[in-house]
C-alpha cells in the first residue's frame, strides 16, 4: 500500500514538474499583437500569402530542392498560413508562419549537434542560426524564418520588427486575402517586376518585357491551379503586341482595364507553378 502511494506520488510529482517546466517556458512567449507583413518588412521584390490547407502538394514541390528542405518542412507541418517576402538583391526569403508550434522545445528541435547556433535578442527572444536558414519561434502561435544567401538579413533585425513593424504598401485584394484568417485557400502573390515573372510563365525567360507590378491569385483545382492575373502595362506603344503575345500562349480570358492587363480563368499545373515560383529565388533565376 505504501509502495503504491509512493509510486502515485512520484508520478504526480513528475507530471507537475513537467507542467511547471512547460509553463515556465511559455511564460516568456511574445504576448503583444503581431503584424505578419510588418515583420517580413518593406522593399521586397515579391510578396506572397500562402494558406497551407489545400496547397500542401505545391509547397512540397517548391521546397523540394532547397538545402534546408527538412528544416523548412518541420515548420510547414505546423503552419496554417505563410506570409512571405523575397528580396532579389540579397537572395533571401523572409517568412512569417501562423500556426501551432512547439515553443517550449525549440532547444531540442534546433540543437547545436545539428548545426544550429542559439542566440537571444535584446528583448529576450531566442533564435537559431545555421548556414542557410535562421529560425525563431517567439510564441506558440507564430514562427519566423529567413533562408537564402550569406547576404541575408540577420534574424535579430527581423525580430526587431515585432516591436517596430515595417509594413509594405500592397494592393487591396492582396491585403484582403491576407486577412482571410484561414477561410480562403487562395494563394496570393504581388511581384514588383511583373515582366520578369510573366516571361517565365510564358516560357520565354530571355525576353525582356517593359511591364510594371503584377498581382496573381491562385486556387487549387485537382492537380492544377486556376488563376487570375493583373499586370501593370508600361510603354503604351507596345501594349497591343504584348497583349497579342500573351493571348497566343496562355489559354485564358484576356482584356485591358485602364493601364492594366487582366488575365482570368487561366490554368497552370502545380508542377509548372512550383517551377516558376522556385525560379524567382534560385541562383539562376535571381542572378
Curated annotation (Swiss-Prot):
Disulfide bonds: none
Annotated region (Amphipathic helix 5), positions in chain: 155-162
Chain segments carrying region Amphipathic helix 2: 56-63
Region (Amphipathic helix 1): 36-40
Region called Amphipathic helix 9, residue ranges: 270-279
Span list, region Amphipathic helix 3: 69-77
GO cellular component: cell outer membrane
The organism's place on the tree of life at top rank: Bacteria
Region of interest (Amphipathic helix 6), residue spans: 172-179
Chief site of localization: membrane
Post-translational modification summary for this protein: Palmitoylated upon expression of a fusion protein with first 46 residues fused to PhoA in E.coli.
Region spans: Amphipathic helix 8: 240-250
Keywords assigned: Cell outer membrane, Lipoprotein, Membrane, Palmitate, Signal
Record-given protein name: Outer membrane protein TP0453
Organism from which the protein derives: Treponema pallidum (strain Nichols)
Amino acid at each position: 500500500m505504501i509502495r503504491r502511494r509512493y509510486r502515485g506520488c512520484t508520478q504526480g510529482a513528475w507530471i507537475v514538474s513537467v507542467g511547471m517546466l512547460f509553463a515556465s517556458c511559455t511564460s516568456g512567449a511574445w504576448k503583444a499583437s503581431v503584424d505578419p507583413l510588418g515583420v517580413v518588412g518593406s522593399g521586397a521584390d515579391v510578396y506572397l500569402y500562402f494558406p497551407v490547407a489545400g496547397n500542401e502538394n505545391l509547397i512540397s514541390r517548391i521546397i523540394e530542392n532547397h538545402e534546408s528542405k527538412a528544416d523548412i518542412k518541420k515548420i510547414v507541418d505546423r503552419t496554417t498560413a505563410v506570409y512571405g517576402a523575397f528580396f532579389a538583391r540579397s537572395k533571401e526569403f523572409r517568412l512569417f508562419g501562423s500556426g501551432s508550434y512547439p515553443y517550449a522545445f525549440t532547444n531540442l528541435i534546433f540543437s547545436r549537434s545539428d548545426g544550429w547556433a542559439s542566440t537571444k535578442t535584446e528583448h529576450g527572444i531566442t533564435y537559431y542560426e545555421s548556414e542557410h536558414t535562421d529560425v525563431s519561434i517567439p510564441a506558440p502561435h507564430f514562427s519566423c524564418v529567413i533562408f537564402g544567401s550569406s547576404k541575408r538579413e540577420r534574424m535579430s533585425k527581423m525580430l526587431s520588427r515585432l516591436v517596430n513593424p515595417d509594413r509594405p504598401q500592397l494592393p487591396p485584394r492582396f491585403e484582403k486575402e491576407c486577412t482571410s484568417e484561414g477561410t480562403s485557400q487562395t494563394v496570393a502573390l504581388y511581384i514588383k517586376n511583373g515582366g520578369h515573372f510573366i516571361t517565365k510563365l510564358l516560357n520565354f525567360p530571355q525576353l525582356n518585357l517593359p511591364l510594371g507590378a503584377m498581382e496573381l491569385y491562385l486556387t487549387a483545382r485537382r492537380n492544377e491551379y486556376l488563376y487570375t492575373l493583373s499586370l501593370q502595362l508600361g510603354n503604351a506603344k507596345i501594349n497591343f503586341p504584348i497583349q497579342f503575345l500573351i493571348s497566343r500562349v496562355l489559354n485564358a480570358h484576356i482584356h485591358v482595364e485602364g493601364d492594366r492587363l487582366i488575365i482570368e480563368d487561366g490554368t497552370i499545373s502545380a508542377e509548372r507553378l512550383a517551377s516558376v515560383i522556385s525560379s524567382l529565388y534560385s541562383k539562376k533565376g535571381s542572378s
